[in-house]
Amino acid sequence: MNSIHIKKKSNRSFRRRKVFGNEKEFDLEELDDNDIRLRQALEATKRRKIRNSIIGINAEKLLNQETKKEKQLNTANEPHEANDQTSAQSSKLIEAQLPTVEDRFAKQTNEVDINTHLLNFVEKKLKQERLAQNYSENGETNALNTKNESTVQNIKNSLHPNEHSFIRDAAALGAIREVDLGIISTDVDNLKNGRKRQKKRARMKEKLDSKALRTSEDAARDEFIEKMLKPISQDEESKGIYRRFRVYKDGTQD
């Protein structure tokens, strides 16, 4: 099996401090304080730290930092050196600085006053509401005290829209909306019982319709049967008047 090799970390205090990002590597201790390369190296390390830091804006750091204008004023108040090289170095440093929060947003032009703009907007809305109220009360365009005819027409259209401009609701036309009955509507047993009841009602209706009205012949037949089924008295039996079937002289019977 391969053995695991753990590399020991060397003491960082004895390591050579190098700044990467430029074309050449150099030791910071060998440079002079006024050297442009030292300042550029410090700016490069500063940019790298900010780039590798957590995404977002830290309010405390921004408050502690100076703005670009303040830095320019501070550099202007410092004593100028006679050499042109130092002035060029300072200008390059100012240009190389990171933009602050104020520089990231567009500056105000002060061309539009926000307060007056909002007041005009509110007054316009109130005027339209007053016009609509006057129109609803009077019902005539002559009663409107306005100069803008387009706004009057818009208000009129909003109060009395065209009938063809919208779709009528089904409930307004008297249609019954679909109602979800839940589990009852999807239960198989309830559906079967409902079908059975419908079939039974249909059969009962057919039976009632099939029964014809009673005629005179039906009434005479029923009367004859009632007479035949009456109990026979002794007198009638002795006389032979009442029989189950009446026999005539010619031999026929009914």
UniProtKB/Swiss-Prot annotation:
<keyword id="KW-0507">mRNA processing</keyword>
<feature type="region of interest" description="Disordered">
    <location>
        <begin position="69"/>
        <end position="90"/>
    </location>
</feature>
<dbReference type="GO" id="GO:0000380">
    <property type="term" value="P:alternative mRNA splicing, via spliceosome"/>
</dbReference>
<dbReference type="GO" id="GO:0005681">
    <property type="term" value="C:spliceosomal complex"/>
</dbReference>
<comment type="subunit">
    <text>Component of the spliceosome. Interacts with brr2.</text>
</comment>
<dbReference type="GO" id="GO:0005829">
    <property type="term" value="C:cytosol"/>
</dbReference>
<keyword id="KW-0963">Cytoplasm</keyword>
<feature type="region of interest" description="Disordered">
    <location>
        <begin position="195"/>
        <end position="216"/>
    </location>
</feature>
<keyword id="KW-0508">mRNA splicing</keyword>
<dbReference type="GO" id="GO:0000398">
    <property type="term" value="P:mRNA splicing, via spliceosome"/>
</dbReference>
<keyword id="KW-0747">Spliceosome</keyword>
<dbReference type="GO" id="GO:0045292">
    <property type="term" value="P:mRNA cis splicing, via spliceosome"/>
</dbReference>
<dbReference type="InterPro" id="IPR010756">
    <property type="entry name" value="Tls1-like"/>
</dbReference>
<protein>
    <recommendedName>
        <fullName>Splicing factor tls1</fullName>
    </recommendedName>
</protein>
<feature type="compositionally biased region" description="Basic and acidic residues">
    <location>
        <begin position="205"/>
        <end position="216"/>
    </location>
</feature>
<feature type="compositionally biased region" description="Basic and acidic residues">
    <location>
        <begin position="69"/>
        <end position="83"/>
    </location>
</feature>
<comment type="similarity">
    <text>Belongs to the TLS1 family.</text>
</comment>
<comment type="function">
    <text>Plays a role in pre-mRNA splicing by facilitating excision of introns featuring long spacing between the branchpoint and 3'-splice site. Assists the splicing of several components involved in chromatin organization, such as several shelterin complex subunits.</text>
</comment>
<dbReference type="GO" id="GO:0005634">
    <property type="term" value="C:nucleus"/>
</dbReference>
<keyword id="KW-0539">Nucleus</keyword>
<dbReference type="Pfam" id="PF07052">
    <property type="entry name" value="Hep_59"/>
</dbReference>
<feature type="compositionally biased region" description="Basic residues">
    <location>
        <begin position="195"/>
        <end position="204"/>
    </location>
</feature>
